[in-house]
């Protein structure tokens, strides 16, 4: 699933090419890709002839403000892509929604797994009411509101593993498997350590590392594991510099120990047994 750096990369790419241009037409090829309105034709009619004024990101959600005050919201989920095409091309097998712009340009929503969703929300609609998951998101981790005190308070009574806690969007908005593994490695924390056992010093270090890793991910254009690419069709490059994620069986870049992988709450976790000793997770 695209995480904060990937979604931010998409947002920045869309701002470069779609702003102030009227949407001349919309085509919905898979009805269930449209969450609201319930009828795809209504989705089409509300967006036709509108222009995008601004793109924002909230966690893993993309939000476009249109020139009439309405909103287009998109969640890429597991495999969604938003691709910008400057010349007409027939839709590929997994194309779900197409937005057409002047000069024959097209914004295309491609989604192999079909979990991605699009919403059109009228100007008087509260976004968090229409999409309840947005109401529970933590502050943006690269904003001033995401403080050490906030993170400490959320972890203080959390009995889950620290890896599982970091994936909770009410604790770190936009965090996913890749950057959680990277953050725990740089913090020296074993993924199975109970979140509530972290010391104030560990929480402070983890907070700083989360911000660092997410910024580095954005600077690298995100991570391409299977399907992610920017609107311009460019792959993300963070994977080539990853400390542990996706590197099972390879040598740790710090100490040379073999990177291991375990299953935790149904998710894979990559870690270095030497740099993230299991002893730090025992007896706490």
From Swiss-Prot:
Q: Which residues bind DNA?
A: 94, 113
InterPro entries, per database record: DNA_glyclase/AP_lyase_DNA-bd, DNA_glyclase_Znf_dom_DNA_BS, Formamido-pyr_DNA_Glyclase, FPG_cat, MutM-like_N-ter, Ribosomal_uS13-like_H2TH, Znf_DNA_glyclase/AP_lyase, Znf_FPG/IleRS
**PROSITE patterns noted in UniProt:** FPG_CAT, ZF_FPG_1, ZF_FPG_2
| UniProt GO MF annotations | 8-oxo-7,8-dihydroguanine DNA N-glycosylase activity; class I DNA-(apurinic or apyrimidinic site) endonuclease activity; damaged DNA binding; zinc ion binding
Q: Which UniProt keywords apply?
A: DNA damage, DNA repair, DNA-binding, Glycosidase, Hydrolase, Lyase, Metal-binding, Multifunctional enzyme, Zinc, Zinc-finger
The record's remark on the cofactor is: Binds 1 zinc ion per subunit.
Q: Which cofactor does it need?
A: Zn(2+)
Instruction: Look up the EC number in the record and give it.
Output: 3.2.2.23, 4.2.99.18
The organism's superkingdom is given as Bacteria
State the Pfam families in the record.
Answer: Fapy_DNA_glyco, H2TH, zf-FPG_IleRS
Q: Which residues form the active site?
A: 2 (schiff-base intermediate with dna), 3 (proton donor), 60 (proton donor), 267 (proton donor)
Q: Which GO terms describe its biological process?
A: base-excision repair
In this chain, the FPG-type zinc fingers fall at: 243-277
Catalysed reaction(s) here are: Hydrolysis of DNA containing ring-opened 7-methylguanine residues, releasing 2,6-diamino-4-hydroxy-5-(N-methyl)formamidopyrimidine; 2'-deoxyribonucleotide-(2'-deoxyribose 5'-phosphate)-2'-deoxyribonucleotide-DNA = a 3'-end 2'-deoxyribonucleotide-(2,3-dehydro-2,3-deoxyribose 5'-phosphate)-DNA + a 5'-end 5'-phospho-2'-deoxyribonucleoside-DNA + H(+)
Which family does the entry's similarity section mention?
Answer: Belongs to the FPG family.
The subunit field of the Swiss-Prot or TrEMBL record says: Monomer.
Function as written in the Swiss-Prot or TrEMBL entry? Involved in base excision repair of DNA damaged by oxidation or by mutagenic agents. Acts as a DNA glycosylase that recognizes and removes damaged bases. Has a preference for oxidized purines, such as 7,8-dihydro-8-oxoguanine (8-oxoG). Has AP (apurinic/apyrimidinic) lyase activity and introduces nicks in the DNA strand. Cleaves the DNA backbone by beta-delta elimination to generate a single-strand break at the site of the removed base with both 3'- and 5'-phosphates.
User: What PANTHER family does the record tag this protein with?
Assistant: FORMAMIDOPYRIMIDINE-DNA GLYCOSYLASE
Recorded protein name is Formamidopyrimidine-DNA glycosylase
